[in-house]
């Protein structure tokens, strides 16, 4: 009897080991640059982007990643917007050797008193791996996409996709695509099972019909490779993630776009049960959340879903890797990477070291491995997602729910004589009590300075202009920002005028 019990315990332990859950995180870090002093973007020239700025960015990325797995970090991270190394070495970087070489220094020392030309020559992802290691986020293999593009491309590439993973890497391939960062394919082995990872950063301009044909080309690049894999194994385990510069419901949200990359070409869709049929092989995990909770970025007062995770049918069967149903989420942490109004705390260059995180929230999902080896059996789904079409869900940010009195800056809270016009104050909500300024623009005189007043709601803009004459009192809550170098307050909702 004891022997049988021992055998049972051994088998149970083996199954438990196989079923260890892991997380895949997709994270656009908003332009993580190295410190070699060579950059294509104006904002990242040495006069504006210092070693202290780089340290802040590295530290803050690590702080977000450390929110997962009890501080250990996810086992798979798909990064976007890491700078291409414009001063590369003659040989590819050996990230393990770099970490070993600088094991006796901290990232603060490397970018501070111990900085030298060799450190300046390190690519951004190597600096990130070091910042991770200092925080106990260790054991990662680092894979960077090649800086390649199609012959038809007309734009140079400033950024690349990078994958961090703790799983053994079996195969790596970079896929050049039209006027966008190369799509990075990484095949890993998870408890003996193959898992394909695809890290994407498609052409920007989600709402622009003029750029959608480029995203269609990006989608075709990815779809062609997926078809190769799925022809060989229709139940292959594939996780597709990154910044697609497309909404999960691109075709529904922008009906004037006759052909969309994400929906029409790639085949991303929201019927969770449909992946069991031959006609549909991909499911977009945004459909795991209620429509009101779908958002990872903001633009003109509306939520966007540019960051996405998409899974293949194989992640619903009982062979190899399996998706944990209902585990998809948005990585927004109050007091860390989230503003008081619930939007992403963007990166800011203000001050000697900068501040903030990214203009995108990361997205994540959990997975496990299953020992059955059965592709004909599918994960039972309770309340399976089913996209039934119809009008697109509301995307306007509900600013009326914000406790303005609690979070707003006031004139009394500022030091005497201080200006609001700093990078650190951008994005903050301010209680404005001033007077309407003279001129053709609607503007307010506040704390001795003049600010434009704007709203993305055209009707509200017209009402504000009609109701407020030059010299009259003007009281409202506004989000501080800049547009074309002019400082302004954005009134996000009619309830903010009071």
Give residue ranges: language-model regions.
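N-terminal, active-site-proximal structural segment of metallo-dependent hydrolase catalytic domains
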Residues: 17-158, 350-351, 368-406, 493-495
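Metal-dependent phosphoester-hydrolase catalytic domains
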Residues: 174, 178, 228-236, 246-416, ...
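OB-fold single-stranded nucleic acid-binding module
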Residues: 272, 388-498
């Amino acid at each position: 009897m004891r022997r049988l019990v021992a055998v049972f315990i051994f088998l149970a332990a083996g199954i438990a080991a196989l079923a260890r859950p892991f997380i895949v995180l997709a994270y656009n870090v908003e332009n993580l640059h190295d410190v070699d002093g060579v950059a294509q973007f104006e904002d990242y020239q040495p006069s504006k982007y210092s070693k202290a700025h780089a340290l802040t960015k590295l530290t803050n990325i690590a702080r977000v990643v450390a929110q997962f797995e009890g501080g250990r970090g996810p086992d798979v991270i798909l990064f976007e917007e890491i700078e291409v190394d414009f001063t590369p070495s003659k040989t590819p970087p050996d990230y393990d050797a770099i970490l070993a070489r600088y094991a006796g220094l901290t990232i603060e020392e490397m970018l501070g008193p111990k900085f030298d030309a060799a450190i300046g020559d390190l690519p951004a992802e190597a600096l990130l791996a070091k910042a991770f290691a200092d925080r106990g986020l260790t054991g990662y293999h680092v894979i960077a996409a090649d800086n390649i593009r199609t012959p038809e491309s007309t734009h140079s590439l400033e950024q690349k996709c990078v994958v961090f993973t703790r799983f053994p890497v079996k195969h790596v391939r970079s896929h050049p695509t039209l006027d966008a960062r190369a799509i990075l394919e990484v095949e890993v082995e998870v408890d003996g099972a193959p898992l394909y990872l695809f890290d994407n950063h498609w052409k920007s301009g989600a709402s622009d019909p003029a750029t959608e044909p480029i995203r269609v080309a990006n989608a075709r690049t990815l779809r062609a490779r997926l078809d190769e894999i799925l022809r060989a194994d229709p139940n292959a385990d594939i996780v597709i993630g990154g910044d697609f510069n497309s909404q999960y419901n691109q075709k529904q949200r922008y009906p004037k776009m006759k052909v969309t990359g994400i929906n029409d070409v790639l085949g991303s869709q929201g019927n969770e049960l449909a992946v069991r049929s031959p006609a549909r092989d991909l499911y977009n995990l945004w459909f795991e959340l209620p429509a009101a909770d779908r958002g990872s970025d903001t633009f003109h007062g509306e939520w966007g879903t540019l960051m996405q995770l998409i899974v293949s049918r194989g992640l619903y069967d009982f062979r190899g890797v399996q998706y944990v149903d209902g585990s998809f989420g948005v990585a927004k942490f109050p007091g860390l990477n989230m503003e008081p109004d619930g939007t992403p705390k963007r990166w800011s260059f203000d001050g000697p070291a900068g501040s903030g995180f990214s203009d995108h929230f990361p997205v994540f999902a959990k997975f496990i491995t299953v020992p059955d080896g059965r592709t004909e059996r599918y994960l039972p789904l309770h309340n399976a997602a089913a996209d039934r079409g119809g009008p697109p869900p509301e995307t306007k940010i509900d600013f009326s729910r914000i406790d303005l009195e609690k979070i707003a800056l006031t004139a009394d809270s500022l030091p005497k004589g201080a200006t609001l016009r700093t990078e650190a104050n951008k994005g903050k909500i301010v209680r404005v009590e001033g007077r309407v300024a003279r001129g053709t623009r609607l503007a307010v005189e506040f704390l001795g300075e003049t600010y434009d007043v704007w709203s993305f709601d055209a009707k509200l803009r017209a009402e504000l202009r009609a109701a407020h004459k030059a010299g009259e009192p003007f009281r409202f809550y506004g989000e501080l920002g800049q547009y074309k170098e002019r400082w302004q307050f954005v009134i996000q909702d009619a309830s903010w005028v009071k």
